[in-house]
Amino acid sequence: IGVGHFEPLRHYAEVHLKLEPLPRGKGLVFESNCSNDELALNWQNLILTHLKEKQHKGVLTGSPITDMKITLVAGKAHLKHTEGGDFRQATYRAVRQGLKEAQCVLLEPYYSFELIIENQYVSKALFDLENKHCAFKIEEDMNNLVHIKGNGPVRELMDYQKDVIAYTKGK
């Protein structure tokens, strides 16, 4: 739950948002689960508009957030002091605070790879791939060639093709 509060002199807005992960590729989904008795429908619609109008950035790398459901669960307005821009600030603050509370984890990017090499270089390749923390499987021999498929951390495999070319002499 992220809570955003905006209350400078003669302004007031408070927004409570629930942030939930969605399956990969689902995009961002916004909805309201807030009672009209608690917050007027026009303010709820305004908050949903503010959520949709901006590309929100994550707190770890500043990358755009994806595949998340953001639900308005509560909000507060003041009859005399609330204006539309107040909810914009409170909404953005609620998203940011919710992301900070979410205990986000930065996932390491991985490459998928296929390596087809001669039998004589297999032990060197397997040694390298294990040292680079790769997961792989070895396919059947094909005319003195071995087919290795797997994946591993980008930071370890960035320049690995140069190593393969060097120890196989380009074969």
Which ranges hold each PLM region?
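Accessory interaction regions appended to the cores of large information-processing enzymes
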Residues: 1-171
